[in-house]
Amino acid sequence: VLFRSLVEKEKYQYSSTPPYELISHQNLSAEEGLYLKHFEDIFDRYYNSKRFRFSINYLLEKIDPNTLFSRLLEHHDSHGLLMNPVSLDEYYRIFQDTFYPAPTSMEQDLLKLDYLYAQRSFRLPQILASKSPGKTWKKDRKTPVIPFNHEIEICGSQANLKVAANTVYYAVAHAQNG
């Protein structure tokens, strides 16, 4: 009874089937509610997934969080990708197209690092791949050794990159059980 009186008083509109999502109320239009739902989806895909931890931290030094995620939302919206599945490799292309259309070597290295940290993969997507000597890490003989233009120091979710005089090679290995 209390809920019903609140619904009427505040003019809540919600979907009639589970999960009973809010559509609008007297202070939030349906359009604003949909925008928030899409913004949350983009935030989950890029930030909460931790797939772009280093690139996002780098960008947050230059632009505010709302601008960052709004730009990703605009890209997804303009390409018909909202609330639709996207391949993992495609996320990295979208991120690069949105923020690094002509990536610097630092931006390219950050995206490579993000990909290698987030994916248990033995290859980079085409947009991040560079000529590699085809070597693998001696310890497991399958983890690729990837060329970078920077010396990299990781501290939590922050990556400190320092321009290297020569190409530096790194292998990002994941624990077997997690």
Predicted regions mapped to residue ranges:
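Catalytic cores of nucleotide-enabled group-transfer and carboxylate-activating enzymes in metabolic
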Residues: 7-9, 14-20
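Radical SAM enzyme core and accessory elements
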Residues: 33, 38-178
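Polar, glycine-rich mid-to-C-terminal structural blocks
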Residues: 22, 30-33
